[in-house]
Amino acid sequence: MVEPHPQFRIMAAANSGGSGDSSGLYSAAVKVQSRAAMNRYNVFVRVNYMEAPEEMALVRKHVPDLSDAASDIMLAFLTNYRKGFADGEITTPISPRNMLTLGSYVSAFEGRIGYASALERGLNTVIFQSIDDNDAPVVRGIADRVTP
């Protein structure tokens, strides 16, 4: 018999709770997990996205040169995007990694072309190039409402 160390812990991510993805959004990456394997875990915790202000604080921590003006617009964009996603109007999620990339892009260019142009280019490069075509009109509408 192998006895585990008293402080031994294991954690695993199962983005779909092991049930796979019925939406088709993650068809290549999220598969149905073995029920036998899933039964070995006795605690499941659903972790939602962090609140938009927290996420933007994370972006500001990692991209300290990002202007307040750009950060405020990114916060408004993220808040509205996540609401659209939660309400089912948008099917493509936006992650903290996306926002960090957007913040880095905007910060790199806003000193040369201004924050408004940097945001427009950043949104086009980081967000619009990666969303589902069906989401584009809704996401573009959000961007149009919050950007100068």
Can you annotate each of these PLM segments?
Residues 1-148:
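C-terminal regulatory/interaction module of P-loop NTP-utilizing enzymes
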